[in-house]
């Protein structure tokens, strides 16, 4: 077996199939497993997907939320075992792949229209 085929086989076995399909502009609830010492807990991060990048095992996505008036962005590897589950709350209608312009918008201007 060549190196390329070996890498492809290992990568395919590591990909997760239990995740919903989502796009930029969608609102997600990401349940992340956090380990603190010997304790383990689930932390929920809810926000708008502002970008997706990469492909295969190295694919990542960034979720942005407003917490106490401060914008918080968190980037997650899509296929990591640390993500317990991803819930799709609503689908957003956007015409861009990267929503960096949301960083400069405040309040109602930062809303994204929902797909019916």
Curated annotation (Swiss-Prot):
Keyword Protein transport: no
GO biological process: translation
Ribosomal protein is among the record's keywords: yes
Gene Ontology molecular function, alphabetical: structural constituent of ribosome
Pfam families named in the record: Ribosomal_L19 (PF01245)
InterPro entries for this protein: Ribosomal_bL19, Ribosomal_bL19_CS, Ribosomal_bL19_sf, Translation_prot_SH3-like_sf
Keywords of this entry: Ribonucleoprotein, Ribosomal protein
PROSITE patterns in the cross-refs: RIBOSOMAL_L19 (PS01015)
GO cellular component: cytosolic large ribosomal subunit
Function noted in UniProt: This protein is located at the 30S-50S ribosomal subunit interface and may play a role in the structure and function of the aminoacyl-tRNA binding site.
Family designation: Belongs to the bacterial ribosomal protein bL19 family.
Entry protein name: Large ribosomal subunit protein bL19
